[in-house]
From Swiss-Prot:
This is Gamma-glutamyl phosphate reductase. InterPro entries: Ald_DH/histidinol_DH, Ald_DH_C, Ald_DH_N, Aldehyde_DH_dom, Glu-5-SA_DH, GPR_dom. It comes from Maricaulis maris (strain MCS10) (Caulobacter maris). Pfam families: Aldedh. The gene is proA. It catalyses: L-glutamate 5-semialdehyde + phosphate + NADP(+) = L-glutamyl 5-phosphate + NADPH + H(+). Pathway: Amino-acid biosynthesis; L-proline biosynthesis; L-glutamate 5-semialdehyde from L-glutamate: step 2/2. One of its GO terms (cellular component) is cytoplasm.
Length: 418
């Protein structure tokens, strides 16, 4: 089985490599036409996609998966329209390919340009959320990259319809269908072989839980762009407007609990905790609060936290609460437990905000805003392929620009080097 799976992945890679050479020089107009046609196909086949998604959702319900997991998987008419609209939005964005990043005129007459080019072939491994396949396919297409999608086994039926719609867009624009492919099997050996397919795959991007990302990090021979878990913090400083803080925290936790930008840990300055915490518990009635002894003393509705709570991405209606003595203690707690995704401060004190923004070394750091804004669409990228929490190549929401590399074009008039 393993040899057959390796051959299957290599065949997908070979086809993707051939398609990537065509995409690398495809005009912006053709790429945009493919995206618009793909969005139309998603709308046209909405009923097919809903039925496929129903089968997927029924499967995870029978398996006893939690509600937050089911929410990430589930599609409805509004979410399908959102997927189609996101694909269309990418068509309206500037094409990053061919953009001149720098120009150098040398004393010997050589003119050198640094120009943005596609990465080549991208492997995208993700869990649960079928819309990730459409976002990744659209972003890779617009940036001139071929992509091999490996969705979670729980979303196999939904992913299959989405990929068929994306391929329909490619056909309409006379671009190679192999530019967007999926690994159409739940066999886990497929992931291992994709991670080791150095001959054909230039970059692998995992998007999912800590287990998936750790597996990719440990087994990959192909370069990776890691999207770690979102243990996001919101710190309420002594100088916060508490009405503003309540609204921000409720949105940051409960708007959608199952996304990586949801706040998982609340850090409160002790000077405002007795006022703020009971207000939050009264308002956020569906949320479970787990706190340190100081938080439990303020409001007995808070359940005692243990050490693991400070490092847990709940992806559910649960929030850890830490009471701290001042800005330095707040920064130290966030720095010790953040996953490097997104962290926020709520305060009207400009100096405190400046200090927090400088000292917290996360991909996204916010002031007086919900952490759920940590999203490529909200950043004007149209969509995102993930949130990179590392520091190399790309950081934060990964959009079109981050899916390109560059090469140097050197223009001469017969110069020879002495």
């Amino acid at each position: 089985m393993s040899d057959r799976m390796q051959a299957y992945i290599e065949q997908l890679g070979r086809q993707a490599r051939a398609a990537s050479r065509v995409l690398a020089t495809a005009s912006t107009e053709r790429k945009n036409a493919a995206l618009i046609a793909a969005a139309a196909a998603l709308r046209l086949r909405a009923n097919d996609l809903l039925e496929a998604n129903r089968i997927d959702v029924d499967g995870v319900r029978k398996a006893g998966k939690p509600d937050a997991f089911i929410d990430r998987l589930m599609l409805d008419g509004a979410r399908i329209e959102g997927v189609a609209s996101a694909v269309e939005a990418i068509a309206t964005l500037p094409d990053p390919v061919g953009r001149v990043l720098a120009e150098i005129d040398r004393p010997n007459g050589l003119r050198i340009e640094r120009v943005a080019v596609p990465l080549g072939v991208i492997g995208m491994i993700y869990e649960s959320r079928p819309n990730v396949g459409a976002d990744a396919g659209a972003l890779c297409l617009k940036s001139g990259n071929a992509v091999i999608l490996r969705g979670g086994s729980e979303s196999l039926n939904s992913t299959r319809i989405i990929v068929e719609c994306m391929k329909e867009g490619l056909r309409e624009a006379d671009l190679p269908e192999d530019a967007i492919q999926m690994i159409d099997t739940a066999n886990r050996d497929a992931v291992k072989h994709l991670l080791q397919c150095t001959q054909f795959v230039d970059l692998v991007i995992p998007r999912g839980g800590k287990g998936l990302v750790t597996l990719v990090r440990d087994q990959a021979r192909v370069p990776t762009l890691l999207h770690l878990d979102g243990n996001c913090h919101t710190y309420v400083h002594a100088g916060a407007d508490l009405d503003k803080a309540v609204a921000i925290i409720e949105n940051a936790k409960l708007r959608r609990t199952g996304i990586c930008g949801a706040t998982e840990s609340l850090v409160i300055d002790e000077s405002v905790a007795a006022d703020l915490l009971p207000r939050l518990i009264d308002r956020m009635t569906v949320c479970e609060f787990r706190g340190d002894p100081a938080a439990v003393t303020i409001d007995p509705r808070v359940k005692p936290a243990d050490d693991s709570d400070w490092d847990t991405e709940y992806l559910d209606a649960c929030l850890s609460v830490k009471i701290v003595d001042g800005l330095e203690a707040g920064i130290n707690h966030v720095a010790a437990h953040s996953s490097g995704h997104t962290d926020a401060i709520v305060t009207e004190d400009a100096d405190a905000a400046t200090c927090f923004l400088a000292m917290i070394d996360s991909a996204v750091v916010m002031h007086n805003a919900s952490t759920q804004f940590s999203d490529g669409g909200e950043f004007g990228m149209g969509a995102e392929i993930g949130i990179a929490t590392g520091k190399m190549h790309a950081r934060g929401p990964v959009g079109l620009e981050q899916l390109t590399s560059f090469k140097y074009l050197v223009h001469g008039e017969g110069q020879t080097r002495p």
